Structures are given as C-alpha cells and as structure tokens.
C-alpha cells in the first residue's frame, strides 16, 4: 500500500516533502528524491536536507526549480519565480 506524496513549498526557501522513500542524490545545487509514485529533482543554491521524521524531508536553500517525473510517466517542471 503506497502513500501519496505531499509537497508544501514556502516561497523559494523551504520545501516540505512527506512520504519520501529514498534520497537518490544530494549536493548543494541538486537533490533527487524518490517517492512511491514520483522522482523529484530540486535545483537551487545552498540546498540542505533535514529529516525530522522518517517519512518527512525538509529542503532548505534557494529553490530555483522542482521537476516531477511520475514513475513510467511524463516529465513535468515547476520553476520558482
């Protein structure tokens, strides 16, 4: 039974991601995260990840874009303005 992914973006400085399965890549300009149904790419500057609970990941820094790729589906991008 898979849980839905929940994203909460606060401006371009903070992203809360619930139901995260695995962090695939992590550096100060790019964080790639796998959830039950998505692969998320977060691009920016001075990015940091903080896991406060096993299911919840907070990403801080200057978030410039978020790319969502459904597993086996089409690719979508949301850019911070």
Task: Give the location of each predicted region.
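Mature-chain termini and adjacent capping regions
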Residues: 1-25, 30-81
């Amino acid at each position: 039974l898979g849980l839905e992914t929940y994203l909460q973006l606060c401006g371009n400085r903070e992203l809360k991601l619930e139901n995260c399965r695995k962090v695939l890549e992590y550096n100060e300009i790019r964080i790639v995260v796998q959830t039950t149904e998505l692969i998320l790419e977060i691009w920016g500057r001075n990015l940091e990840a903080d896991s406060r609970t096993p299911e919840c990941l907070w990403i801080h820094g200057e978030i410039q874009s978020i790319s969502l790729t459904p597993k086996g589906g089409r690719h979508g991008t949301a850019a911070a303005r």
